[in-house]
Design a protein with these regions (language model features):
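Flexible "arm" and connector segments at domain edges
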Residues: 1-100
């Protein structure tokens, strides 16, 4: 196998970048073509499906990094705190700019 990545942390972090980029690409396609539209080559899979699938691919890579001890594992409470804080900030931003 030809690769310049010789250790697990490098490889897994590269996969995180790859999956995050694929989420970005799926979201961009949703904005361009519609969230419920699909790639002509995959008519049974919508752009919304692509976003969700790529999110869970990224989640799997984060989980592997946690299992390897490269990233810290969070409790469910810590996860919820981070998520809820982000939601609060985004909702406040949208409200401040009249986004409905």
């Amino acid at each position: 196998m030809d690769t310049v990545l010789h250790n697990k942390p490098q490889y897994l972090l590269t996969k995180v970048i790859e999956e995050a980029t694929e989420i970005s690409q799926a979201a961009t396609k949703s904005l361009t073509f519609g969230i419920n539209n699909h790639n002509p080559l995959t008519p049974n899979k919508s752009n919304a499906d692509d976003i969700i699938n790529e999110f869970y691919h990224l989640d799997a890579m984060i989980e592997m990094l946690q299992q390897e001890g490269i990233l810290p594992k969070l409790t469910k409470e810590e996860e919820l705190k981070i998520k809820n804080e982000k939601k609060r900030k985004v909702n406040n931003y949208m409200k401040g700019y009249g986004v409905s």
